[in-house]
Design a protein with these regions (language model features):
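NAD(P)+-binding Rossmann beta1-loop-alpha1 motif at the extreme N-terminus of oxidoreductases
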Residues: 1-57, 123
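Short loop segments at secondary-structure junctions
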Residues: 130-132
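Rossmann-like NAD(P)(H) cofactor-binding subdomain of soluble oxidoreductases
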Residues: 36-38, 46-49, 55-60, 64-128
Length: 132
């Protein structure tokens, strides 16, 4: 599995740390350079992480894309990006609903997830809202 994270804040980094503490089979993780210091820390910690400077490149190279940006940033950048229909999208964006995400991305293969920071230590719930 190849994951791509658009947005590299607390929740995205907690998910990444949790992934590497788990037994998930991850081939590669691409992350955005938006939070440069955190992105560098993640890439130095794990050899399977690569920082990319272009969000479209993250989408193109990943099989599963996680949207971990604020609602304001999401509304600004998502309409400029192209998502193919075969990509799986997991939105961590709190206030952009599924219908709007489907319209913006032209992709129906989207779920919303609300992980909490304890995911980093493989604890705590993840609320998932499926596409239907």
């Amino acid at each position: 599995m190849i994951l791509g994270f658009i947005g590299t804040g607390k929740i995205s980094s907690s998910i990444i740390f949790g992934i590497f503490k788990s037994k998930l089979k991850i081939k590669r993780i691409y992350i955005s350079s938006r939070n440069r210091n955190l992105a560098k820390k993640l890439s130095k910690s794990y050899g399977k992480i690569k920082i990319l400077n272009n969000n479209q490149e993250i989408i193109d190279k990943s099989s599963v894309i996680l949207l971990g940006v604020t609602p304001n940033v999401g509304n600004k950048i998502l309409p400029k990006l192209r998502f193919s229909k075969n990509k799986k999208i997991i939105s961590l964006i709190s206030t952009i609903n599924l219908n709007k995400l489907k319209k913006i991305t032209k992709n129906n293969n989207i779920v919303r997830a609300i992980p909490l920071p304890p995911i980093e230590i493989k604890k705590g719930p993840i609320i998932v809202c499926p596409p239907e």
